[in-house]
Amino acid sequence: MSEIQSLTERALADVAAAQTPDQLEALRVALLGKSGSITAQLKQLGTLPAEQRKAAGEAINLSRDALTAALSERKHTLETAALDARLAGERIDVTLPGRRSERGGLHPVTRTLERIVEIFARLGYELSDGPEIEDDWHNFEALNFPPHHPARAMHDTFYFGDGRLLRTHTSGVQVRYMDAHKPPLRMIAAGKVYRSDSDQTHSPMFHQVEGLLVDEHSNFADLKGTLSEFVRAFFERDFEMRFRPSYFPFVEPGAEVDIAWQQPDGSTRWLEVLGCGMVHPNVLRSVGIDPERYTGFAFGLGVERFAMLRYGVNDLRAFFENDVRFLRQFA
């Protein structure tokens, strides 16, 4: 009995002194494992006299239970201490400055496009859309560009092998709109167009807005009034404007619109901003509208051109280089 008590006291002291889980596991094996000290005492019960076995067995069981409880408690203590140490090392310093979320914004071309569409919406124009991959009929023939007409060369077209093409203007949307609606009608088409051209003021892909009005009594004076109001609303100031005769196959007469633009040095020069004209009778006929009864006017503008003027950008290519330093100015 005294031997078991002495063994238990030494073992409890060793358990309390264990500093790591590995040390504690080694003690458990040495005490309670198959070859452990307490297990050996149990195996020796059969060698004791019968009158001593009961008391010795009870003492050994009490010792085993005490050691098992001590091992479990010490294991929990060591695990808690290890967790506290790890958490202390991973503690977040709440006094550190936070990471600022970057503020985004619309691309300047998108902002300009939305501004143009909103102005024409106030004037009663409905926004319509169409495919960027067009057929020859909607992009050229219906707009008074017969096959082999030299005016087609002005468009620097991207063709596919099956005869389809990347639209060179949004005028094809006007043809589709007139096919689906009866006069009177008033619409604008906005989106990407493609031409094989690239320099400081041209891009192979750019954005265009075109407008169309067809009614029984529309005339060139209505066209001038509409565009004058648009230019004033877009730039938020009045400009001296002039309409120069020009050629576009789908209008007759056709004109280009210039505004008197003030230079940084204070001088003024004429700056082209729009193309326009009265819808050609052949275009109306191609969509089943009687040109003897209805007349109309059309106009078109490059969105990047207006964005360059509005934001003072000299090189159109800056809009497509994705330079965050440049784009952040407009966020």
UniProtKB/Swiss-Prot annotation:
GO terms for cellular component: cytoplasm. The keyword Transport does not apply. It catalyses: tRNA(Phe) + L-phenylalanine + ATP = L-phenylalanyl-tRNA(Phe) + AMP + diphosphate + H(+). Pfam families: Phe_tRNA-synt_N, tRNA-synt_2d. Gene3D superfamilies: Bira Bifunctional Protein, Domain 2. Its cofactor is Mg(2+). Its EC number is 6.1.1.20. It is found in: Cytoplasm. Binds 2 magnesium ions per tetramer. Tetramer of two alpha and two beta subunits. Belongs to the class-II aminoacyl-tRNA synthetase family. Phe-tRNA synthetase alpha subunit type 1 subfamily. This is Phenylalanine--tRNA ligase alpha subunit. It comes from Xanthomonas axonopodis pv. citri (strain 306).
